[in-house]
Amino acid sequence: MIGKLKGTLEHIFEDYIVLDVHGVGYVVFISNRLRPSLPSVGEALSLFIETHVREEAIRLFGFATRAEQEWFCMLQNVPGVGAKVALAILGTLSPDELAQAIALNDVAMISRAPGVGKKVSERIVGELKSKTLPFEQAVKTVSVPQREITHQPAHDALSALMKLGFEREQAARALALAMNALEGEAVSSALLIRHSLKLLSSPT
């Protein structure tokens, strides 16, 4: 199995590149997020590699960071999510944004990925929420994405908390903890605000 490749970028195509390693050209599939950060053709490039062995072919998937590679593997543990869907998600969301979306039950954010519908997004949230970092640790270690939170009650609650003077990141973390505590209940923006304010007013 190939875990990492370091060589010279030889060609860039729509959804893959050719990486020359000591005269051997490797076809490596990449995400849309990685493409803009690629060096120019002829320059050095190092990628973490996930190898898929199938009866008909061997495919290599390349990632700039270990975190992206780990999320790629984790996503494929969800029923109905294959390599193509996992790569599409990572082409739309960074690992931090994906972790935040799962923490906030933000199905709409995950659904922004091409070919990813609401049912698949809900399955991803349901399957991976308990398999990622412990919740409190996760919301402390991921950065809050600058894009809009699309879960409507959370979005409304976030706007209200920011109007009360709380920083966006501080408010979003409190919201994430509130949503985790209220999981399984009918969540309204008012309920989220009340729980978030309790957390924000508690001594750290």
From Swiss-Prot:
Keyword Disulfide bond: no
Disulfide bond residue pairs: none
Domain I, as annotated region: 1-64
Pfam families: HHH_5 (PF14520), RuvA_C (PF07499), RuvA_N (PF01330)
Quaternary organization: Homotetramer. Forms an RuvA(8)-RuvB(12)-Holliday junction (HJ) complex. HJ DNA is sandwiched between 2 RuvA tetramers; dsDNA enters through RuvA and exits via RuvB. An RuvB hexamer assembles on each DNA strand where it exits the tetramer. Each RuvB hexamer is contacted by two RuvA subunits (via domain III) on 2 adjacent RuvB subunits; this complex drives branch migration. In the full resolvosome a probable DNA-RuvA(4)-RuvB(12)-RuvC(2) complex forms which resolves the HJ.
Record family assignment: Belongs to the RuvA family.
Protein name: Holliday junction branch migration complex subunit RuvA
Main localization category: cytoplasm
Superkingdom: Bacteria
Protein localization: Cytoplasm
Positions of the UniProt region annotated as Domain II: 65-143
GO biological process: DNA recombination; DNA repair
Organism annotation: Bartonella tribocorum (strain CIP 105476 / IBS 506)
Domain statement: Has three domains with a flexible linker between the domains II and III and assumes an 'L' shape. Domain III is highly mobile and contacts RuvB.
GO MF annotations, alphabetized: ATP binding; four-way junction DNA binding; four-way junction helicase activity
Region of interest called Flexible linker, as start-end residue ranges on this chain: 144-154
UniProt-annotated stretches for the region Domain III: 154-204
NCBIfam families: ruvA
Keyword annotations from UniProtKB, A to Z: Cytoplasm, DNA damage, DNA recombination, DNA repair, DNA-binding
